[in-house]
Amino acid sequence: MTDSTPISKLAAILAADVVGFSLKMGENEYLTLKNLKACRAIVDSAIKNNQGRIFTTAGDSVIAEFASPVNAIVAAVEFQKNIMARNASCAEEDQMQFRVGLNLGDVIVEGDNLYGDGVNVAARIESSAEAGGIHMSAKFYDCLLYTSPSPRDRQKSRMPSSA
């Protein structure tokens, strides 16, 4: 580490992990790893398709950053929906469920990694989400309210065409 001033930025952080992963690993490591890889392909694709970047993983957990909370929530909903569809077509022992935490906060940039309360809060929120669920911080939610107009609001804001 250098003595230079750390760079910080505002980021939408997505933290996700598999519910009951340790138990599944204890029951059948090879099957669990095979299923994790299949599910991670779904998760990783949704993150990438919505302009996110995975900056750390550990075992079954994934932490990603997004420039926009809208992209983060779209990615989370997309992969939860796709994991649910996968589970519907799998044997019970092949099913996995993720829980997701979302936060908007300042982070410190160190190489390709991010640190700080913005990341820590997302991880804490994730741990309180139910299986297949998505929890978000109040700050993240408030930002969504002001950046994602409802269909009704979009209709109101349309300008009439000039003749």
Summary of predicted features, one role per range:
Residues 2-75, 81-82:
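Catalytic NTP-binding/metal-coordinating core of nucleotidyl cyclase/transferase enzymes
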Residues 12, 94-108:
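A short glycine-enriched loop-to-beta-strand structural element that forms part of the catalytic core
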Residues 84-92:
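Active-site phosphate-binding and catalytic loops of NTP-dependent enzymes
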Residues 109-127:
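Catalytic-core segments of nucleotide cyclases and related cyclic-nucleotide turnover enzymes
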Residues 121-138, 142:
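Catalytic/regulatory signature loops of cyclic-dinucleotide turnover enzymes
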Residues 146-151:
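Conserved small/polar residues in nucleotide/adenosyl-binding loops
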Residues 157-163:
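Hydrophobic alpha-helical segments, chiefly the membrane-spanning helices
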